[in-house]
UniProtKB/Swiss-Prot annotation:
It comes from Escherichia phage lambda. Plays a role in morphogenesis of the virion head after genome packaging. Presumably interacts with the portal vertex to stabilize the packaged DNA within the head after packaging. Probably binds to the head-tail connector protein FII. Monomer in solution, assembles into hexamers on the prohead. May bind FII and portal protein (Potential). InterPro entries: GpW (IPR004174), GpW_sf (IPR036626). This is Head completion protein. The keyword Calcium does not apply. Belongs to the lambda phage gpW family. Keywords: Late protein, Viral capsid assembly, Viral release from host cell, Virion. It is found in: Virion.
Length: 68
């Protein structure tokens, strides 16, 4: 499974948890990991790790300002 596929699966699992499904399962490094509603923060950290590994994160920018 590629990192992109892992990221898509992790995002789908997060969506499932956030919409009321009690348990979501993700393949992580060749093993099966189950996340529950109480481990949403762990799943978000995992998604952030995958985004870094795939180069999908962008640095946050400050608010746009109007200068005269």
């Amino acid at each position: 499974m590629t990192r992109q596929e892992e990221l898509a699966a992790a995002r789908a699992a997060l969506h499932d948890l956030m919409t009321g499904k009690r348990v979501a399962t993700v393949q992580k490094d060749g093993r099966r990991v189950e996340f529950t509603a109480t481990s949403v923060s762990d799943l978000k950290k995992y998604i952030a790790e995958l985004e870094v590994q795939t180069g999908m994160t962008q640095r946050r920018r400050g608010p746009a300002g109007f200068y005269v």
